[in-house]
Curated annotation (Swiss-Prot):
Catalyzed reaction equations: S-ubiquitinyl-[E2 ubiquitin-conjugating enzyme]-L-cysteine + [acceptor protein]-L-lysine = [E2 ubiquitin-conjugating enzyme]-L-cysteine + N(6)-ubiquitinyl-[acceptor protein]-L-lysine
Entry's family note: Belongs to the RNF152 family.
Name of protein: E3 ubiquitin-protein ligase rnf152-A
ZnF start-end (RING-type): 12-55
Database matches in InterPro entries: RNF152_C (IPR045744), Znf_RING (IPR001841), Znf_RING/FYVE/PHD (IPR013083)
GO BP: cellular response to amino acid starvation; negative regulation of TORC1 signaling; positive regulation of autophagy; protein K48-linked ubiquitination; protein K63-linked ubiquitination; protein monoubiquitination
Function: E3 ubiquitin-protein ligase that acts as a negative regulator of mTORC1 signaling by mediating ubiquitination of RagA/RRAGA and RHEB. Catalyzes 'Lys-63'-linked polyubiquitination of RagA/RRAGA in response to amino acid starvation, thereby regulating mTORC1 signaling. Also mediates monoubiquitination of RHEB, promoting its association with the TSC-TBC complex and subsequent inhibition. Also mediates 'Lys-48'-linked polyubiquitination of target proteins and their subsequent targeting to the proteasome for degradation.
TM annotation in the entry: 167-187
PROSITE patterns attached to this UniProt entry: ZF_RING_2
Pathways per UniProt: Protein modification; protein ubiquitination
Superkingdom of the source species: Eukaryota
Amino acid sequence: METLSQDSLLECQICFNYYSPRRRPKLLDCKRTCCSVCLQQMRACQKDLRCPWCRGVTKLPPGYSVSQLPDDPDVVAVITIPHASENTPVFIKLPSNGCYMWPLPVSKERALLPGDIGCRLLPGNQQKPVTVVTMPMEQQPLHGNIPQDIVEEEHERRGVVKSSTWSGICTVILVACVLVFLLGIVLHNMSCISKRFTVISCG
């Protein structure tokens, strides 16, 4: 088989979608790999599974489904499909002296798979390479691998956010009180001005 790039190894060569728990990499008898969704569509249209490239037939016994075909071990080794729900958080690990973890948004269409390498923009348009790592919920460290000073800094930052919210609310209330006070002074002065021009009768 010809040498494939890392990206083409991670995607089905029929639909060009990345392999995922829903689109598992299935191995045909001719040793080519397609995603389970494409193979299910092919199976619905024809009795036997024919490889789109070499036309080799992969026979499935009666009552067997595409999901019972073996996964391609080479592809599975690269993508390491996790047994987790789509709500499992995904983190990136920055290669540096310390270990920093940042939550990433996960979309269904273009979700990053474990082992994907990307980059994160830093101030000054510098790029830092990152590697994506997924962790099942029960294995996620609370603060085990993160240095204590970073944990404290994060707690302080969250405390600042809470205190800045309260200080904003207090500021609004204080400004409202000052405006009511000033309005009272203005109204009082206006009532005094109108009394100045009235005739005072002497008794």
